[in-house]
Structures are given as C-alpha cells and as structure tokens.
Amino acid sequence: LDQFSNPDNPLAHYEGTGPEIWRDTRGGITHFVSSMGTTGTIMGTSRYLKEVNPAIEIVGVTPTEGSSIPGIRRWPEEYLPGIFEASRVDHTLDVSQQDAEQTALALASREGIFCGISSGGAVAAALELSEQVDDAVIVVIICDRGDRYLSTGIFPD
C-alpha cells in the first residue's frame, strides 16, 4: 500500500474530500486545516480547493519539537513522503502533545466526538487559527478514532 508514496492517496482526497468540503460550505471555506502524517489528505484536498479558489489558506499541523503525536509528523527534508509538495501548504502550525491530548479529551467529553490524538492536534491548531483570523470559515479534518488510544490513559474511565 505505501500510503506515503501512493498517488491514489492524495487522489482520493482530490476527488472526494475537496469537492465535499467545497459543496458543504457552499464555497465559503476560507481556511483548511489538516494534520500531516502521510500528507495524502492535505495534498489532495489542497489541490482541489486551490483550483476552485486560490485564496483558500491551507494550514498543515505538525508536532512541536519534542512532542510525539501519533499520526502527525515533523518530517526532516530528506524523509518527506513522496506525495508531499511543499507548494500545496501555505503554512504550518505546531501543536504540543499535551494540547493535542487535552483537545481530544475535550472533544470527547464536551462534544461527544471520540477522536484520537492527531485529530485533537488538528482541532487545537484550528482553534488557535480561529483566534488569529476574523470572519473565517475554517474546516478541520478529524482523521482518527479515540478507541485506538484507550490504553494511553488520556481518556479517563
């Protein structure tokens, strides 16, 4: 499968995720936020969104130095996934492991969204972005499930 180099990975998001976001926001999206693991989601969705509106800001989420957030990586230049194109990301926001875990817990307890740590990181970045911009329509991808993290202790009994 090799989702880090498989062109079908971003293609699925170019053909599916991007058009769905555009349709569901009625073209109102101003910012797209996505964690950067394989980078397939952000690559394919960015490609589609920039084709329909180049003004949409694409924001990648990376862990702060020293943080370990499953599913989100801080890629050294020499190890970037084969599908990654830097020109498709306008900028990145760093998120700490603690913020990612706390946001995942808050989403579960307050909103009933049982997501994983990488999704917590993406939502934390989107919330940070929302404090920096006015009148924005920010779309963030929740890409993992919380059941994969039950053994980590971030979700209390």
Mark where each language-model region is.
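Glycine-rich cofactor phosphate-binding loops and adjacent beta1-alpha1 units
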Residues: E20-V61
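Hydrophobic/aromatic beta-strand patches that form the interior of the parallel beta-sheet core
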Residues: L1, V33, V59, H91-L93, ...
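Glycine-rich beta-alpha junction loops
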Residues: S5-D8, G37-G40, T62-S67, P76, ...
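Active-site/ligand-binding loops adjacent to catalytic centers
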Residues: K50-I117, Q132, G153-D157
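Short glycine/serine/threonine-rich phosphate/pyrophosphate-binding segments
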Residues: S35-T45, S118-A126, Y149
